[in-house]
Amino acid sequence: MASVFHYFLLVLVFLDTHAAQPFCLPGCTCSEESFGRTLQCTSVSLGKIPGNLSEEFKQVRIENSPLFEMPQGSFINMSTLEYLWLNFNNISVIHLGALEHLPELRELRLEGNKLCSVPWTAFRATPLLRVLDLKRNKIDALPELALQFLVSLTYLDLSSNRLTVVSKSVFLNWPAYQKCRQPDCGAEILSSLVVALHDNPWVCDCRLRGLVQFVKSITLPVILVNSYLICQGPLSKAGQLFHETELSACMKPQISTPSANITIRAGQNVTLRCLAQASPSPSIAWTYPLSMWREFDVLTSSTGEDTALSELAIPAAHLVDSGNYTCMASNSIGKSNLVISLHVQPAQALHAPDSLSIPSEGNAYIDLRVVKQTVHGILLEWLAVADTSKEEWFTLYIASDEAFRKEVVHIGPGINTYAVDDLLPGTKYEACLSLEGQPPHQGQCVAFVTGRDAGGLEAREHLLHVTVVLCVVLLAVPVGAYAWAAQGPCSCSKWVLRGCLHRRKAPSCTPAAPQSKDGSFREHPAVCDDGEGHIDTEGDKEKGGTEDNS
């Protein structure tokens, strides 16, 4: 009887002991340390922070796991947690309330995650936090008040991130730094503020001037883990140590030009120059009245530190190029504008260059283009500027020998588009625009060709996204056909198609590569003008068809 009672007593003791043993997650290790109970989970497939952790844990280590966020209320039952290590996970987001219910937290280590930013105000909930390890993340900015709520912080590691520019105010606003700058701050505290900032891609321009000065003059209570901070940019500073770098103060762009008022003859080349001095280096852009229609080459170069020169080249200037050209320079500090006035005077008729679009016997500048496909054809758009003060009417001529189509449209003032409908496949068309009562002239015409019938809906869909090949533009048109339009002037001396279309010449276009919706290139018959008014396609050859080019 005594032996039975003794056995029963042992069972009760065993059950009581195991009932009191705290729960440990499967695959993890729980242990008792000098500071309390520890949970360590390494290379465990945890998609989120477990919500059933015991409040008896003083340290939690979850490392090399697929954690991707720290959601709000992650540690609601762990008010006594002091050490939280979440190194080498995939955490990219820390929610604002993630650190709530952790008033006793002393260490937060997040090394080797994917954080681009940190909700710094979340540290209001952790007034006792002393160690914050954020190295090897993707943090690219520090707000000036980032450390405002880290009142007890003594160790901050931001090394191996993507910081380029940081204000010295970040550290001047650090409460622990301010406290230890007081005259009565003890020597014991003076050596306790440790910061790691190395291995970041620092851009050593004027915006980093304050931090560079701070690092140069750093003394206790701040200690840098690695004081050899290196500039990665700009190119003139790359490789220099902070201690070797002298940076100027920031300033908004100041613009100058050799000449703000330029007068030239039509047909002459002219280059407008704009010199901008700024720190950091400025970006420069040009605006002018006809920028949507006439694009000029712009060359911007660096002539020295914090100095940029921009040159806008206008070849063979037209009368319509007269006007104000605005050079705009901007940087992070501000922007400035400079206006250059260009006056283009008429050239003598006998010496007018061939490249001018204004005919000697006319008095208008006209730029005619095929701009897009419409439901039933194409859309023409033009810029027309008459050399008179009165409102001018224009005449649009549309013709095709193959389609036996000749159309004359009278265009009133203020209209600059016209839709050409009911186009036939495999046909070349030409459109010309001139002043009312005048015949079309060289430089005012545009030729376009519709492709052969491409078949079903799928074939037509593949032609909606195309590439530009030299001066040729592929356009989808109804019933699966497609067209290219020569954007340059027609070479005919008279407004007749026969001279252009029936002159013998080699194929004048290269195979174009239509793009599908996914951006890949698909094989498609190339459309070429063989000089005899018909369209030759590679698709015909695949079908075994032949064309008589003799």
Curated annotation (Swiss-Prot):
Disulfide bonds join C274-C327. Residues 200-252 form the LRRCT domain. LRR repeats lie at residues 80-103, 104-125, 128-149, 152-173. Residues 519-550 have a biased composition (Basic and acidic residues). The gene is LRIT2. Residues 253-341 form the Ig-like domain. Residues 23-54 form the LRRNT domain. Residues 1-19 form the signal peptide. Residues 361-451 form the Fibronectin type-III domain. It is found in: Membrane. GO terms for cellular component: membrane. It comes from Homo sapiens (Human). PANTHER family: LEUCINE-RICH REPEAT, IMMUNOGLOBULIN-LIKE DOMAIN AND TRANSMEMBRANE DOMAIN-CONTAINING PROTEIN 2, SYNAPTIC ADHESION-LIKE MOLECULE SALM. Pfam families: Ig_3 (PF13927), LRR_1 (PF00560), LRR_8 (PF13855). Interacts with LRIT1; may form a heterodimer with LRIT1. This is Leucine-rich repeat, immunoglobulin-like domain and transmembrane domain-containing protein 2. Glycans are attached at N52. It is a single-pass type I membrane protein. Residues 508-550 are annotated as: Disordered. The keyword Transmembrane helix applies. Keywords: Disulfide bond, Glycoprotein, Immunoglobulin domain, Leucine-rich repeat, Membrane, Repeat, Signal, Transmembrane, Transmembrane helix. The chain crosses the membrane at residues 466-486.
